[in-house]
């Protein structure tokens, strides 16, 4: 709660700090509450901050605030829109404004592109394809994620109200391998969804429960090689998932295809 980002050296000695931007584009009435970070090879800092919906806060390596990038597009429900047309002033003031939503988490890949995810979605926008819970941002903040798959990149395609869970997947964190396969973590049902560089779902696994490989409250995901690491916030535990033989063949096929070994890739598939 010190409203700053600290930069430390390898021995944890203080180097510098990044503090609340003093700029007309940053609401000075808001507290600066950074919660997620990504750093590029030039030392620039990209920050997700609580209550900031203009996109990622960008700092140069010297600590200077240089603006926002990657603001999400405004989405709204047509029912809410029509209701606002006929509501009284008092009723409109009580309703949520149509504003861009916040990001939950970010991950910078090996090329310097930023994968960003948000749980601020609705059933209707997920169903009609207007919501993008996962994005891939270039340095201009434009979403360049390829969506050529059969289904929208939203986790579960169908959802019900069984087992004490309801509603769609909420992608709370994301990580990406060097072969452009990325994996999103659903905090509702504890599932992991993997997609290739074209947006095709490769596999999904996981769930909530007390058995090995299941979660109580999954909150973060990362990887080491092709091993996936998932943090359980409630259990205070870290689960490590190593690829099965099936998973190894998937990664092998993708790696071979990217290396131009098309026949070998076909055999692996």
Specify the residue positions occupied by each region the protein language model found.
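Eukaryotic scaffold repeat domains enriched in small/polar residues
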Residues: 1-269
């Amino acid at each position: 709660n010190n409203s700053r980002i600290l930069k430390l050296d390898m021995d944890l000695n203080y180097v510098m700090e990044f503090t609340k931007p003093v700029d007309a584009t940053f609401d000075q009435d808001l507290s600066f509450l950074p919660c997620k970070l990504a750093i590029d090879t030039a030392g620039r800092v990209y920050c997700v901050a609580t209550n900031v919906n203009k996109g990622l806060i960008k700092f140069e390596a010297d600590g200077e605030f240089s603006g926002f990038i990657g603001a999400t597009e405004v989405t709204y429900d047509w029912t809410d829109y029509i209701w606002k047309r006929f509501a009284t002033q008092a009723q409109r003031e009580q309703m949520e404004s149509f504003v861009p939503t916040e990001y939950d988490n970010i991950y910078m890949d090996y090329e310097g592109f930023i994968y960003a995810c948000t749980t601020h979605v609705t059933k209707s926008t997920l169903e009609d394809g207007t919501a993008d819970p996962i994005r891939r941002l270039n340095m201009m903040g434009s979403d360049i994620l390829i969506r050529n798959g059969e289904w929208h990149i939203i986790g579960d395609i169908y959802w019900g109200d069984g087992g004490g869970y309801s509603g769609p997947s909420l992608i709370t964190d994301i990580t990406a391998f060097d072969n452009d396969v990325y994996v999103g973590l659903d905090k509702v049902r504890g599932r992991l969804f993997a997609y290739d560089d074209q947006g095709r779902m490769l596999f999904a696994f996981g769930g909530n429960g007390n058995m090995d490989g299941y979660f109580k409250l999954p909150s973060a995901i990362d990887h080491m090689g092709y091993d996936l690491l998932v943090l359980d916030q409630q259990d205070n535990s870290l689960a490590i998932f190593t690829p099965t033989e099936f998973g190894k063949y998937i990664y092998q096929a993708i790696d071979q295809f990217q290396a131009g070994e098309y026949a070998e890739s076909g055999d692996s598939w």
